[in-house]
């Protein structure tokens, strides 16, 4: 704590797995060598009517694996795998408290990140440069102890620059692929709370993707406590996701198989869930 309102923390992590093993004696390392640096700095300002939370982070990692050595053919080239990763990110949240008793506030959130990966699987290569920017504006208030409303706007932008050589031939020319998507959206969420016994939350949001067009996402959550030791939950909702086949599965380049990537549509799914939890105090 610097003073009553301002506090900060610095987090650092270092990892070095410098030893390799081949316990099953198959000529390949059982796990890669990893050297990683991780740094984060967070700040918090908590005032009477204004709260700020922000931070920055950086990560750098080297990961190497592959064959341990030659097996009877010293002239053959060893199969090596190497991944060099760098990631930088920053985020902030500004909260303006209008009425503390009613829980009325407006919050502005923003974040940005850059992620770079240089990967090699033998002579196959995969280099990616990803940039993301996200911002949202949220309003929340309690009409009464039983009724709460949250509504907001959001904007998400993704850029994915990829360069890939999908054949194990160092003379082959890499292929460059760029993907961009901007998604503005709006949402509203209503929560009903009855003496902490029954909680019902219904939400809906609408987004417009520059790639896939407009889509609507509803959801519903129910929580019921008939007794102090039994909790019942039900949930249902719809979800959408933009697939990035190579970014999510680039490890398959280590295989000798031929990879074929079709034009992928936006993923769409309904999700349902139910649970019952029993809490029995022993003492």
Describe each PLM feature range:
Residues 5-24, 36, 103-122, 149-156, ...:
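Surface-exposed extracellular loop regions of Gram-negative outer-membrane beta-barrel proteins
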Residues 2, 43-50, 96-98, 139-143, ...:
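Residue-level signature of outer-membrane beta-barrel architecture
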């Amino acid at each position: 704590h610097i003073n009553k309102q301002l506090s900060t923390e610095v987090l650092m992590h270092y990892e070095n797995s410098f030893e390799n093993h081949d316990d099953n004696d198959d000529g390949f390392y059982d796990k890669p060598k990893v050297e990683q640096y991780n740094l984060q700095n967070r700040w918090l300002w908590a005032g009477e009517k204004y709260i700020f939370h922000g931070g920055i982070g950086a990560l750098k990692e080297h990961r190497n694996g592959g064959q341990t050595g030659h097996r009877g053919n010293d002239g053959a080239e060893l199969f090596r795998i190497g991944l060099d990763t760098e990631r930088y990110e920053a985020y902030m949240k500004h909260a303006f408290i209008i009425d503390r008793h009613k829980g009325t506030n407006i919050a502005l959130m923003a974040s940005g990140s850059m992620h770079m990966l240089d990967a090699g699987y033998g002579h196959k290569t995969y280099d990616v440069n990803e940039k993301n920017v996200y911002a949202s504006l949220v309003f929340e208030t309690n009409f009464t102890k039983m009724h709460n409303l949250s509504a907001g706007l959001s904007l998400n932008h993704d850029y994915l620059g990829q360069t890939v050589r999908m054949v194990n031939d160092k003379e082959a020319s890499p292929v460059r692929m760029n993907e961009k998507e901007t998604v503005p959206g709006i949402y509203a969420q209503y929560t009903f709370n009855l003496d902490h016994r029954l909680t019902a939350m219904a939400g809906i949001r609408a987004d417009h993707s520059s790639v896939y067009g407009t889509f609507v996402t509803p959801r519903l959550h129910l929580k019921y406590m008939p007794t102090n030791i039994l909790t019942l939950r039900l949930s249902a909702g719809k979800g959408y996701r933009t697939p990035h086949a190579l970014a999510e599965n680039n490890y398959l380049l280590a295989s000798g198989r031929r990879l074929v990537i079709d034009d992928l549509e936006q993923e769409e799914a309904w999700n349902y869930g139910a649970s019952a939890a029993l809490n029995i105090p022993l003492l």
